Structures are given as structure tokens and as C-alpha cells.
């Protein structure tokens, strides 16, 4: 668990038991009935934060009824209590999470320190802030919303509000920009106080490893990439390279090593002098063998656009690490982009850890309760549904081949469509969604994937109409409810078809959860084959396939948890160093550490930024090659932590002397400082592929086993 998480608690021990929760709920409902008798003028006196959270929630419940004409159900009030108590509330699809969060948000906002309400995209941030604004305003609370493309002044105004809706990426980029400000007035955020996380499993788990990066300046394009790409195109699977049984790593065979050495005339590919070439070859091999167009990325407008594997959407402003990004660009023969120098970086996990108060909500949290507890110190409270769930979840249908499975899916779509029921078909990729679309000739349908994600809200809004057929990637899993059209409940409601099982049970459950909202009828069925990627990767081909898949998903989730916890040990030391260096920088920026002149202040800030950027580059290089130390029997983590500590001590020791040197050389009043660069996020390679050097090391280990490098 993070050392710096100081989570707020209401009286969590007593609130844990269902009996206590029911008692609190009764008191709140009784108080709500009393408050209904108050006039608006009398009611506004309750705008101040009450001493008791139950009283405060009752006030907000009544305000919602008066302002936006929405009555809160018991389950929504229970969810609000859980979030006020610093928990993750699991509230099923269609149960009204947006409204349920408002009493908890208002409770924290009344402390006067502001609340970040983080959701998964700009659309939901804008929608929810506008929808709930009358409630907050009646309570005397201001509301802001951060959107991509806003000016610094617009952002500053939004962050000064009592409640600020935003995505974690936008908040993170603003945080990184603030840390590079040359004047205090340039900063847009105030100190973090509390965060309420919508779709908490997506933000706190699925995207937790994604680093937010701010970069500036330019480095030269990779002149080697084109030549390496041409050579890689001549390599053949099994002959020149092998892919591991899970499809996560690729490495050269002896024949492949010889082929590359002859093509480049470089001698021993494993010589230190060839490290840059070897890394470029591994990145190119990875791009060709493991990353697939219309599955992992799109090519649009002459650029590579990665697809978020969990959401099925374009991952905007996101890149792979430099070498792999360049390799994919070379593979698709698009213009190679220049790479910026990294000035600052933070993962979403570390960013959210900076909030002293934290809570959240989602429709799928229980399966990850161990990770919420061990990583964030957050308890998951499962909230019952308002109405009994009557959706029918049929057993999986198992086939020997993908071809048989796909035909069965098409047959089921036709059968349900003839009955007049709407059908939602969930697919794993853009490629799969378009393949099924092509098979449905003669059946009117809509396809939703990363190519047309801007139409998501409109397409999903029509998906519950009689006879509607919607084929979608994971995009249709969150954010927008599928409401049933007239007469659809009598026909049996929405039927959901899953065309494969995913590595995470949560993704499957999100798809199922599109049907049967708030007691509506509905059904779901998953179709799987022994040729599905999930099963092929993990060698599952037994007759009891459904049981095997369930067990496999639990094992994969446990493995991913272990990996994330292990990788946090690598990142935690850098995060502590970042906090230390930024504290010093902020003191200089705000005048806590007085300087003899404005020039000296500017030079000091620019020097800190420059040395920190150098430190990040050195740490990145260290981590990229740290796997080599295990070849000598040493522990990579221990060696990494030791070296990073020594490197940071060197940085701190250089600061004063470097500032003095640069100040002595400054002839322009300190104005010659770096300009802020562009910002982007890039795909983490911690899992599943590993770093380039890790892949090289795996190949080298195999080579040593088969023939001695030194013999």
C-alpha cells in the first residue's frame, strides 16, 4: 500500500455491517421527509457542511429532487454513503452512478479544498458537470469542467471551483505543466485534496501503469529505422524468429541472428558496439510480429493511432516508447515523427496517490477487490440493485474452430433479429467488428469501433430499439446506457452476444451488464472456440472449456496484480525523488527560498528542469538494461534501486554548482530557457511485452544455452 495514502474514513468499522448501513439509510430517509416541508429560502441555510455525513447526504438528496427532479433510490444513497466513507461502490449498470456520487462529492467539496471528479473521457466530464450543476449551485458550490483544448486561464478558473470534472489524463498533464512553470502565476491547479473516481476499475487498474509524459525540444529522426524495417520484412516466423507460447514476446533464432548479422555486416550482433542496432531490430520485430493493424492500432491521416485494449477506442495523444513507435511507423511506411526530450513523467497510479482523500464507483469492482485493497487501501462495497436482476445469462457455447463459432454467432443474430429484439454484439477488435459486419448482408445494423468513436453516444442510444443490431468493440461497455424502445421489454429485452472471452472477467461482465438494467428483461450468451487467442496463448484445449476459461481468467488477473505490485517497487523510488526535487523547485518558484534577483530564480528553475530531465533519461537507460545484471547472478531490483539512489545523490550535489556556473555564463537576463514541449501519453511496455533489452536478454539467454558465445 502506498505510504502516502491517508484515506479519510467516516466511521468505517460501524458502517461495514449491513445492519448499520440500513440504520443509517433509515435515518437519512426520515430526514429527507422532514426536509421536504422546508421552503427553498429555509433550505438554503443547509448549504454549510453538516457535522454528520448522514445529515449532509439527506440535504443533497432533497436538493436533487427540487432542482433536477430526480428521486434518489435507496441503493444510490447507500452508494453515496460508501463513497463518503472512502470506499469503492460497486453499483450495477443503469443504477444511476452519476447521481449517486453527487452527495459524496458535495460532502467533500464543502471542506473548502475542492474535489476532482475524474471520469474516463471528456464527453462524460462535460455531460455530468452540466447535468448536476443545478444541485451544486443550490448548495452554494461552484462547478468547473476541464476539456481538451482549453486555454491556461480557462483551466485555472475550472480548478478554482469547488467541484472540477475532468479526465485523469487532463489533470495529470496540467500537473506536469505546473511543475515546469517559470512563474507561479502560470500554474493552473491548486493543491490536491480529494478525488472521486468514476469507472474506478478502468482508471485505477487498467490505466494505472500508463505514464503521462511532458516533452520539449526535438531529437533527430531515427535514420536506422527504414533500413532495419526492410531487413525485418525478410524474416520468417519459426525460421528466423519465434513467438512465445503466450504471444507476448518474440526473439530471433540462430538462423535469424545470422541473417541479421550478414544483412548489416556487423559481426557479432551481441557486441556492445551493436546494442543500438540490436535494440532497433528487436523493436522492428516486435512491431511486425506482435502488433497488428486494426487490432492494436489504426493508420489514419498518415499517422499511427494506438487502440486502447480495454476501451476499444483510439488512445488519443498516446505513443509507444520511442523505438517501438518508430518501428511501427516504419512498418506502415508513414512519416517518422521526431521524438521529444522527456521533461517530466508520472503514472496515473502515482498521480492519484497524491490525493489525501480518495473514493470511487464502478459497475465492476468486486473481482478486483484484492488489488483495490493492497494497492490503494480502498475497500469495495457491493451495492444491491434497485430492482431484482432478471437478465438470463446463458452458458457459453463452445466450438472447435473460429469459423464454426462465427457462423453460429451470425445464425444467432438472425434468429434474435427476426423476433424483433435488439442485439448487441461485442467483439475484440476493429478487424473482428468489421468482419462480422460483412457477414450480416441483408440485416440493417450499425458498427461501432475506433474508426467512428465520435458517434458512440448516438449509436448506443439507438441500440435498444426494436430490431436494432449493433456490432461493437469494448466501446459500448461504459458511460452510456442502452435504453429499451417501446415494446422491447415484452419481447425479452436486449440480447448481448460476446464473440470471445477476454483476459479480464470485468470486461466480460461489462458487456453482459448492458442488458437487464434496472430490472429490465434481457439475456446474454458468449460464443468461444478452441482457436480463440485467449485459449491458444495459454494452451487451453480441454473438453471442460468453460471451466478452464473461468480458472484461466482468475489466474491471469492474479498474475497482472503481481506484476503491477512488483513494478510499483521500480517506480516508487522515482516518485519519491520527483516529490523531493519538486518541493525544492516550488519553494524557489514561490519565493520561499529567496534569490538575489529574478535572473537567478529563472536560471535556478531552468537548471532544475534540465538536470531532472537528464536524470529521467539516465534512469530510463538504466531500467532498459537492468535485466543484464541477472546474467551475473545479481538481483535486478536491488541493483536498480541502488543505482537510482546514487544517481539522485549526484543530481542533488550538482544543483548548486550548476546553478552558479550557468548564472555566471548568463548574458541574456535568464530569458534563454527551454520552451515547453508537446504533451502525450505512451503505452507502457511493462506488460505484456517487456522492454527491448528484456527481449534481447531472453534471446541471448536462449542463444547461450544452444551455443556458447565465448566458447
Give the location of each predicted region.
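Extended, charged helical/alpha-beta scaffold domains that provide interaction surfaces
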Residues: 298-305, 311-318, 518-519, 534, ...
